[in-house]
């Protein structure tokens, strides 16, 4: 296979990934592949571009490093072109409502007829099978959170609240990335393709697993947080200092002993309620839980964030300031690791945003291109799989493909 023009870099150099999906979840998987060196082709509708393009800045991050193909993959010669593209593809990711591709005649078996080694990742809200009541429903971030039991665990005691921004989309997209890579590893061993069924609600069910296990195995429902504090453990969660907020985790024998001395609770150490060797203070089961919170709140309220961080560093208590977005760029850790970076958009503007993660030492990722315009690479991609100028012109004339104006 001849690859499209792009630099060679990253651990996935030489891998061809194609994705069909809009907004966040499916495309986030494609974004990860593209930043790790894969050749990633983004399929868009001919008549209507991906709705993410209406956003002013986010698409420049989420669609960087991609090749843009505008093709009607379900109709006539457009379908033929898509299936021909699959012959040279390692991983195909589609995000839609349930078995939408199968309903339109593009089943796993059809794809494997054209490429027996193809890894296929289906990403949907409720999965490829189940009850019709659910499998054909649309789903977004909040839908997946609500249906999975994740949303009900978040928020405050007075009201549940979804986790933002778009947590279920990103978790589901990353699940598609890792699952597809696992499948590709096996395919290269066996020569046999794989199909992956990723249901967003199941991803969030797994992400919300921690406290659920107490219910499934004992009937205990974990309460939601109170003002950002851990529902079970005192000294864990969000706290207010004299000049802003911190998060902390008061965990460990030495940490509890020394912290209690600072906040005036040394006298309860070694009691039956806080015996020697205590590593966590349960805010409900320990009678002193409310007192610990009261004393800690009072002590933190009289100290600045800098003072608290310095003291907690001495005591080896995990703690961090809650940074505002404007504070990120100037933070020395961000600067040292170049966590925020800049790149050029296709129209020559400078865009700033999160850098590639994680950081590969020997085969680092790279930003080599901004977001392509609608249909920008259609001609190049079709030529790459054997189409002539005349063939492409015919597809465009029939409304089955769009090339850049």
UniProtKB/Swiss-Prot annotation:
Pfam families: CoA_transf_3
Subcellular location(s) of the protein: Cytoplasm
Pathway: Amine and polyamine metabolism; carnitine metabolism
EC number: 2.8.3.21
Reactions catalysed, as given in the entry: crotonobetainyl-CoA + (R)-carnitine = crotonobetaine + (R)-carnitinyl-CoA; 4-(trimethylamino)butanoyl-CoA + (R)-carnitine = (R)-carnitinyl-CoA + 4-(trimethylamino)butanoate
GO molecular function: L-carnitine CoA-transferase activity
Binding of CoA, residues: 97, 104
Enzyme class, broadest EC rank: transferase
GO biological process entries: carnitine metabolic process
UniProt entry tagged with the keyword Repressor: no
UniProt GO cellular component terms: cytoplasm
Keywords for the protein's UniProt record, in alphabetical order: Cytoplasm, Transferase
Active-site residues, as the UniProt record annotates them: 169 (nucleophile)
Oligomer and partners: Homodimer.
Biological function: Catalyzes the reversible transfer of the CoA moiety from gamma-butyrobetainyl-CoA to L-carnitine to generate L-carnitinyl-CoA and gamma-butyrobetaine. Is also able to catalyze the reversible transfer of the CoA moiety from gamma-butyrobetainyl-CoA or L-carnitinyl-CoA to crotonobetaine to generate crotonobetainyl-CoA.
Family (UniProt): Belongs to the CoA-transferase III family. CaiB subfamily.
Protein name: L-carnitine CoA-transferase
Species for this entry: Salmonella typhimurium (strain LT2 / SGSC1412 / ATCC 700720)
């Amino acid at each position: 296979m001849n690859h499209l023009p792009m630099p060679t870099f990253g651990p996935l150099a030489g891998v061809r990934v194609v994705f069909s999906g809009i907004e966040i979840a499916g495309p986030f998987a494609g974004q990860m592949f593209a930043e790790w060196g894969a050749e990633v082709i983004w399929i868009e509708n001919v008549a209507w571009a991906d709705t993410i393009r209406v956003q002013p800045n986010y698409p420049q991050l989420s669609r960087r490093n991609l090749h843009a193909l505008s093709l009607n993959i379900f109709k006539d010669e457009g379908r033929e072109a898509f299936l021909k593209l699959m012959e040279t593809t390692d991983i195909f990711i589609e995000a839609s409502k349930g078995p939408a591709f199968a309903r339109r005649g593009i089943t796993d078996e059809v794809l494997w007829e054209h490429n027996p080694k193809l890894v296929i990742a289906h990403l949907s809200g409720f999965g490829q099978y189940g009850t019709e009541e659910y499998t054909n429903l649309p789903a977004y971030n909040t839908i997946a959170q609500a249906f999975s039991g994740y949303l009900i665990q978040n928020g405050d005691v007075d009201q549940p609240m979804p986790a933002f921004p778009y947590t279920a989309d990103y978790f589901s997209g990353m699940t598609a990335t890792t699952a597809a890579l696992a499948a590709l590893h096996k395919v290269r061993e066996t020569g046999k393709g794989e199909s992956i069924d990723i249901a967003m609600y199941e991803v969030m069910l797994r992400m919300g697993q921690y406290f659920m296990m107490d219910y499934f195995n004992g009937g205990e429902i974990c309460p939601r947080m109170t003002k950002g504090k851990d529902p079970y453990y005192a000294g864990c969660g969000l706290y207010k200092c004299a000049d802003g907020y911190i998060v902390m985790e008061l965990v460990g024998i030495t940490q509890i002993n020394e912290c209690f001395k600072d906040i005036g609770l040394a006298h309860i150490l070694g009691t039956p309620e806080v015996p020697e060797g205590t590593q966590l203070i349960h805010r409900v089961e320990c009678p002193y839980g409310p007192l610990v919170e009261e004393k800690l709140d009072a002590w933190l309220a009289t100290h600045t964030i800098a003072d608290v961080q310095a003291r907690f560093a001495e005591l080896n208590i995990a703690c961090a300031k809650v940074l505002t977005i404007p504070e990120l760029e100037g933070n020395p850790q961000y600067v040292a690791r170049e966590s925020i970076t800049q790149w050029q958009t296709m129209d020559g503007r400078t865009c700033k945003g999160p850098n590639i993660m994680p950081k590969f030492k020997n085969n680092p990722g790279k930003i080599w291109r901004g977001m392509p315009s609608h249909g920008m690479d259609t001609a190049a991609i079709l030529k790459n799989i054997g189409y002539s100028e005349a063939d492409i012109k015919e597809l465009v004339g029939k409304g089955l493909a769009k090339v850049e104006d």
